[in-house]
Amino acid sequence: LDSSVSAVLIQNCMVIAGIGTLVQLYPVWRIGSRLPIVMGISFTFLSLAIAIAGAHGMGTLIGAVIIGGLVEGTLGLFAKYWIKLIPPVVAATVVTAIGFSLLPVGANSFAGGQGAADFGSMNNWVVGSVTLLACLLCQIFAKGFLRSLSVLVGLLVGYILALFMGMIDFSGLSGLSIVALPKLLPFTPEFNIGAILSVVAVYLVSATETIGDTSALCNSALKRDPKTKEMGAAVCCDGFVSSVSGLFGCTPITSFSQNVGLAAMSGVVNRFTIAMGAIIMIIGGIFPAIGYVLTTIPQAVLGGC
C-alpha cells in the first residue's frame, strides 16, 4: 500500500478504535460491557492478515474480517452457554501465546520490514536497538504512570533518532486536506471460504483474549469477579465493531491489555475519563496530517517497541 492509502487506513483505525471504546463504555443494546476497557486494532490478526492480503488481496481480507466479526459478536450474545469452558488460566495462556507469536513480525520490522530495500541495514539496526533499549530502561527504572508508558517512550526516542538520521520523509504533508471523514469501503469486500474460516479461528482466539482482559480488569482494578453478562457483552463489542472496522478497510479490534495494567496501577476506572481518550482518538482520526505522520514511523522503531 502506498503512503496515501496507509494514511487513510490509519485515520479509519483511530476512529474505529475510539468508537469501539465508547461502545464498550456505553453499551448499545447488549453490545458493550459498561467497563473501562480501551479497544484498539488487534495485533492477534497481524500475521494472518499479512498472509491473506499478500495471497488474495485486501478485498478478501476485508470480507473475512466482516464475516468473522459477525460470528464472534453472535457468540458473545450466547456467552452464558459456553463462557465457563474458558477458565482464567486458559485465557492467560492464550494472551501469552499471542505475544510469542508476534516475535517473528517484530524481528522483521526491527530490521526494516520484510521486502524493504534497506532491510538489515546498519541504520535500521541502530534505530531498532536504541528504541528497544529505551523501552527496557523505562520499564525497569521508571515508576508508576511513566513505567506504563514505556512503549510510548521508546517510540518517541526511536522516532527522534530516526529523524536526525534522515530516515523520515514529510514531503507528503503538503498535499493533505485539513479535515477528512473516514472513507467507507476503501476496498471492495470479496468472500473466500478458506480465508473466512482462518479469520474466524483467530476471532475465537481474540474472544479468549478479551475474556482474559475483562477478568483481569475486574479482579485487579475493580476488586471483584467479572459477571458472565459483562464478558459476553465485551465479546459482542469485540466482534460486531470489528465487522464495522472491516467496512472501513481496517483489521479487527480487541481489548488492550495495556489499559488493564494502567487501570490496576493508577486506580482510574472512571468511564468518563476513558471516554475522553476515545473522543480524542476519533478527533485525531479526522485530521489527515495525524494519520500521515504516523505512517512515517520507521519499521525499525515499531520493531524495537
Residue ranges, per PLM feature:
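Helix-loop-helix hairpins and the membrane-proximal interhelical loops
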Residues: 1-13, 116-118, 147-232
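Transmembrane helix-bundle signature of multi-pass membrane transporters/permeases
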Residues: 11-14, 18, 22, 40-41, ...
